């Protein structure tokens, strides 16, 4: 069988690949030969120098090292390792007792390298210097010759001498700053800070003349009241606070900012009376509702005439100043009618005399038919008043009992009977 003939292109590709592989193999052989022929004189010299340096260092404590090498690290006593760990910081040097012992040269080198960083890394607290040190700017890597260490001068008791010295220092610094180059970043800020720190504080003298300090104070009410009574509604001095409450019709109006008592001699008994004083025209009922202290006084009230409707006293009248408390912006009349509402018995007393006389008492009814009892019940419910109440007998029939001496006193209400 004849082999199929290859095209000339394929033959050229195969030949090129074979040549490439042959070249790679030849290059690898040359590299191997070159590496094997490299001279080893430098390695021998390095080893001899290390041996000599190690022998010189080990002459001092050779006996101690031989003992340590003779004992394996596993059999070493534990207290030796703990002592070494306490002497040497664990962060800087950690000894591993389980590692096999190294050669003498390696130990000598490690020990010499450990002693150097210990001496360099030991932190020492700097002593307190007399003058504060100002570091240069971050952009400058060296200390400029014109930069100085600024320090705060001691305070003297004499402010004038201190001020003159500060002025001289400022002038010298200003002259020195002109000569110094403009690229320094510390001079301008430091001069300003030193001037602000050392400048004396002028307390009460302005150009040698004493100056009165005006402090904002709140004027008292009696002072303002006396000024109003003497000078009218005009302010007396320029030091008083400016007020606009005198424009209002009354100083006790709720819109005023500062309420002042226009009567300095304020009576002690200034609380307002109960609103029940103003709800009836009868003097007898007024005397019944008064407190024991008010009963001793005459019942005539000139400030508030009696009325049937409880209302807040007028604030625009000057007479209402008697009813104001000594606390500003507070009027007891605003809370009396809300907290102490009038009792419902007050209007009932007025109509009791008219209705009790017109409705006669009904005698007790004997239980009868259902039609009679229903008629009696409807008549009783529709015709009873505040002074007449329903009573139930043993059979559940409502009975109307009129005002009499046996159950309820004449002219009294249910509330009075219950309270008694």
Swiss-Prot record:
GO terms for cellular component: cytoplasm; MBF transcription complex; nucleus; SBF transcription complex; Sin3-type complex. Residues 2-70 are annotated as: Interaction with SWI6. The modification Phosphoserine is found at residues 7, 72, 102. It is found in: Cytoplasm; Nucleus. The modification Phosphothreonine is found at residues 99, 419. The modification N-acetylserine is found at residue 2. One of its GO terms (molecular function) is transcription coactivator activity. Phosphorylated by CDC28 in a cell cycle-dependent manner, inhibiting the interaction with SWI6. Transmembrane segments: none annotated. Present with 319 molecules/cell in log phase SD medium. This is Protein STB1. It comes from Saccharomyces cerevisiae (strain ATCC 204508 / S288c) (Baker's yeast).
């Amino acid at each position: 069988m004849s082999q199929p003939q290859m095209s000339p292109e394929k033959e050229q590709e195969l030949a090129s690949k074979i040549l490439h592989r042959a070249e790679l193999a030849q290059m690898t052989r040359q590299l191997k030969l070159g590496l094997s022929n490299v001279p080893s004189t430098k390695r021998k010299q390095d080893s001899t120098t290390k041996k000599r340096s190690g022998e010189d260092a080990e002459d001092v404590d050779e006996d101690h090292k031989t003992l340590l090498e003779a004992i394996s690290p596993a059999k070493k006593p534990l207290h030796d390792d703990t002592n070494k760990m306490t002497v040497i910081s664990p962060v800087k040097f950690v000894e591993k007792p389980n590692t096999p012992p190294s050669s003498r040269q390696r130990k000598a080198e490690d020990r010499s390298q450990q002693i150097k960083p210990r001496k360099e890394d030991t932190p020492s607290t700097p002593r307190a210097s007399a003058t504060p040190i100002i570091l240069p700017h971050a952009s400058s890597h060296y200390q400029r010759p014109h930069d100085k260490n600024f320090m705060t001068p001691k305070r003297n008791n004499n402010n004038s001498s201190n001020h003159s010295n500060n002025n001289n220092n400022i002038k010298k610094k200003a002259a020195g700053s002109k000569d110094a180059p403009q690229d320094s970043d510390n001079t301008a800020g430091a001069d300003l800070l030193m001037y602000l720190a050392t400048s004396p504080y002028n307390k009460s003298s302005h150009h040698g003349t004493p100056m009165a300090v005006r402090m904002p104070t709140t004027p008292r009410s009696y002072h303002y009241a006396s000024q109003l009574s003497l000078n009218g509604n005009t302010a007396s001095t320029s030091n008083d606070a400016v007020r606009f409450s005198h424009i209002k019709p009354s100083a006790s109006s709720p819109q005023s900012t500062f309420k002042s008592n226009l009567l300095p001699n304020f009576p002690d008994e200034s609380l307002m009376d109960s609103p029940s004083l103003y709800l009836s025209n009868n003097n007898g009922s007024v005397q019944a509702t008064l407190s024991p202290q008010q009963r001793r006084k005459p019942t005539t009230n000139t400030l508030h005439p009696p009325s049937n409707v409880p209302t807040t006293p007028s604030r625009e009248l000057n007479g209402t100043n008697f009813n104001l408390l000594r606390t500003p912006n507070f009027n007891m009349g605003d809370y009396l009618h809300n907290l102490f509402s009038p009792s419902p018995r007050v209007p009932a007393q007025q109509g009791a005399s008219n209705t009790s006389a017109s409705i006669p008492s009904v005698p007790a009814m004997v239980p009868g038919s259902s039609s009679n009892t229903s008629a009696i019940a409807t008549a009783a419910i529709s015709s009873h008043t505040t002074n007449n109440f329903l009573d139930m007998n043993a059979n559940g029939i409502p009975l109307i009992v009129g005002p009499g001496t046996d159950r309820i006193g004449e002219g009294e209400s249910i509330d009075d009977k219950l309270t008694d």
